[in-house]
């Protein structure tokens, strides 16, 4: 059963009417309602504000990293553990094939249902998760296997244990080491890109975002609490932070926006997975035309350009 957001109420009503018409085998009514639905979807989703896009990025039915991995990879083989502490299930690492191309996919996994959410720590990685990602990336770099990173986290885990095991160092080391990888690297924000937790697997030759994903230094809830000390200002904060794919492309903070289905990846998962696959194949072909040193030079220049602004 579909989960509807507040701004989808009209869509929900039309879809319920379609179900009733189908049970009555009223084909003319179904045709009329389906055309009405198409117009309502276009009207609703072409006029979303940033807060509504944030809601879509966090939608419980939105495809997570493992959904993309199962749809993209053949002969997938998972890498476990950081060889120092434990295996952090908030980050998954799989070697496999996309078509005939051997790849490594690193993803942040939130989990579905109470049991898996707890196992995955709600998609908030600990230091050992980032160290596992780096271990797998180093292995891929050694054999020049391209890397696809799937970003989807509210942020790195802020618990005492994570801090004791040096969370900030783990993130900083990933930024440093991923910047120096010579194999082609592509990072895609598929849902929520929260702060350093997202940055740790975002340094890449190409950084893209799905149409309804978000990428921010702080959550709108955190911003609302700090700036206004008012939890009712979340929507204002979301619209002010410039966290959407469209905003960040205009600011040249990301390279590309992947056009997931207009109605959202949560409603048309196969189409969303296909769109990401097409982007990966196209981007990888472009990166393969460059030498490893040329890729490093372009990555360096891109990173050095971050932070430029206009008055």
UniProtKB/Swiss-Prot annotation:
Residues of the CoA carboxyltransferase C-terminal domain: 36-286
Primary localisation category: cytoplasm
Catalytic activity as recorded in UniProt: N(6)-carboxybiotinyl-L-lysyl-[protein] + acetyl-CoA = N(6)-biotinyl-L-lysyl-[protein] + malonyl-CoA
A GO BP entry: malonyl-CoA biosynthetic process
EC number: 2.1.3.15
Record-linked Gene3D superfamilies: 2-enoyl-CoA Hydratase, Chain A, domain 1
Pfam families assigned to the protein according to its UniProt record, in alphabetical order: ACCA
Entry keyword annotation includes Lipid biosynthesis: yes
GO-annotated cellular components: acetyl-CoA carboxylase complex
Record bears the keyword Transferase: yes
Record key words, sorted: ATP-binding, Cytoplasm, Fatty acid biosynthesis, Fatty acid metabolism, Lipid biosynthesis, Lipid metabolism, Nucleotide-binding, Transferase
MF-aspect GO terms: acetyl-CoA carboxylase activity; ATP binding; carboxyl- or carbamoyltransferase activity
Pathway(s) it belongs to: Lipid metabolism; malonyl-CoA biosynthesis; malonyl-CoA from acetyl-CoA: step 1/1
Domain of life (superkingdom): Bacteria
Subcellular location: Cytoplasm
The protein's assembly and partners: Acetyl-CoA carboxylase is a heterohexamer composed of biotin carboxyl carrier protein (AccB), biotin carboxylase (AccC) and two subunits each of ACCase subunit alpha (AccA) and ACCase subunit beta (AccD).
PANTHER family per the UniProt record, alphabetical: ACETYL-COENZYME A CARBOXYLASE CARBOXYL TRANSFERASE SUBUNIT ALPHA (PTHR42853), ACETYL-COENZYME A CARBOXYLASE CARBOXYL TRANSFERASE SUBUNIT ALPHA, CHLOROPLASTIC (PTHR42853:SF3)
Family affiliation: Belongs to the AccA family.
Function field: Component of the acetyl coenzyme A carboxylase (ACC) complex. First, biotin carboxylase catalyzes the carboxylation of biotin on its carrier protein (BCCP) and then the CO(2) group is transferred by the carboxyltransferase to acetyl-CoA to form malonyl-CoA.
Protein name, as recorded: Acetyl-coenzyme A carboxylase carboxyl transferase subunit alpha
């Amino acid at each position: 059963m579909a989960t509807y957001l507040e701004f989808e109420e009209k869509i929900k009503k039309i879809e319920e009417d379609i179900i009733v018409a189908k049970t009555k085998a009223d084909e003319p009514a179904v045709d009329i309602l389906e055309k009405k639905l198409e117009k309502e979807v276009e009207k609703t989703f072409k006029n979303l504000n940033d807060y509504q896009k944030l809601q879509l990025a966090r939608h419980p039915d939105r495809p997570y990293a493992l959904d993309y991995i199962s749809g993209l990879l053949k002969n997938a083989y998972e890498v476990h553990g950081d060889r120092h502490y434990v295996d952090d299930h908030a980050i998954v690492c799989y070697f496999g094939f996309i078509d005939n191309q051997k790849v490594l996919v690193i993803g942040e996994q939130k989990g579905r249902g109470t049991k898996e959410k707890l196992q995955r720590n709600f998609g908030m990685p600990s230091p050992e998760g980032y160290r596992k990602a780096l271990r797998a990336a180093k292995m891929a770099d050694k054999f020049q296997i391209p890397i696809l990173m799937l970003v989807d986290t509210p942020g790195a885990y802020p618990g005492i244990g994570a801090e004791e095991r040096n969370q900030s160092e783990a993130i900083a080391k990933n930024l440093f080491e991923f910047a120096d990888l010579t194999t082609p690297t592509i990072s895609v924000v598929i849902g929520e890109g929260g702060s350093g937790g997202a940055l740790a697997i975002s340094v890449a030759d190409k950084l893209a975002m799905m149409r309804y994903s978000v990428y921010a230094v702080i959550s709108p809830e955190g911003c609302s609490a700090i700036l206004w000390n008012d939890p009712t200002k979340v929507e204002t904060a979301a619209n002010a932070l410039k966290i959407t794919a469209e905003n960040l492309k205009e600011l040249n903070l990301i390279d590309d926006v992947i056009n997931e289905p207009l109605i959202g990846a949560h409603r048309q998962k196969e189409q969303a997975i296909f769109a990401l696959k097409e982007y990966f194949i196209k981007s990888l072909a472009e990166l393969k035309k460059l030498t490893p040193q040329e890729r490093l030079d372009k990555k360096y220049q891109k990173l050095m350009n971050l932070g430029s602004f206009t008055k």
